[in-house]
Amino acid sequence: MTDALEQSVLALEGTVSVLKDSVESLKCANEPSTNLASTMLQTKRVFRLVPEYDVERSKLDLIEEVEPLVRTLGDKLRKSMGRMQRELDTLQQTYELNDLRLKKNISMDDDDALNSPDMGQEYEGRDADDVVMMASSTNEELEELKKLKEKKKQLENKLEILKQK
């Protein structure tokens, strides 16, 4: 048995000396060889089967890791959407208020300005004393306000027609 081990050691020492000589000759030659470089640096991919248990466990770990993040992002998104909706409502109310103020200022400056053709129809038929609730008006309340204003405008037009007759 010792003879076999000694022969193995001698064979390995011979292999090591051959490799050292090869490395030395490569250093001395120092000529770039793309073929040699491509064969020496080529990687080999090894695929092996992964047990189904490991795959399922990895999926569950990923779900446990990602699910709270998704929930957190969803909550932040809902809060942000609520904030944006409130801001939109406030901007709509501010628009209505500024629209009425502008109409009131225009009617004070020039009573004929509302009847001129170059003035938008947006201001026709409105009274200067229109009130806009700035408290906590909802979209439904604003829509109802617009409908009521339109109905008021129609009634005023009918009244004007009746007065002219």
From Swiss-Prot:
It is found in: Nucleus; Cytoplasm, Cytoskeleton, Spindle; Chromosome, Centromere, Kinetochore; Chromosome. GO terms for biological process: attachment of spindle microtubules to kinetochore; cell division; mitotic sister chromatid biorientation; positive regulation of attachment of spindle microtubules to kinetochore; positive regulation of microtubule polymerization; protein transport along microtubule to mitotic spindle pole body. Keywords: Cell cycle, Cell division, Centromere, Chromosome, Chromosome partition, Coiled coil, Cytoplasm, Cytoskeleton, Kinetochore, Microtubule, Mitosis, Nucleus, Phosphoprotein. The modification Phosphoserine is found at S107, S116. Its main location: nucleus. Residues 74-104, 132-165 form a coiled coil. It comes from the Eukaryota. InterPro entries: DASH_Spc19. GO terms for cellular component: cytoplasm; DASH complex; mitotic spindle; spindle microtubule. Present with 639 molecules/cell in log phase SD medium. Component of the DASH complex consisting of ASK1, DAD1, DAD2, DAD3, DAD4, DAM1, DUO1, HSK3, SPC19 and SPC34, with a stoichiometry of one copy of each subunit per complex. Multiple DASH complexes oligomerize to form a ring that encircles spindle microtubules and organizes the rod-like NDC80 complexes of the outer kinetochore. DASH complex oligomerization strengthens microtubule attachments. On cytoplasmic microtubules, DASH complexes appear to form patches instead of rings. Component of the DASH complex that connects microtubules with kinetochores and couples microtubule depolymerisation to chromosome movement; it is involved in retrieving kinetochores to the spindle poles before their re-orientation on the spindle in early mitosis and allows microtubule depolymerization to pull chromosomes apart and resist detachment during anaphase. Belongs to the DASH complex SPC19 family. This is DASH complex subunit SPC19.
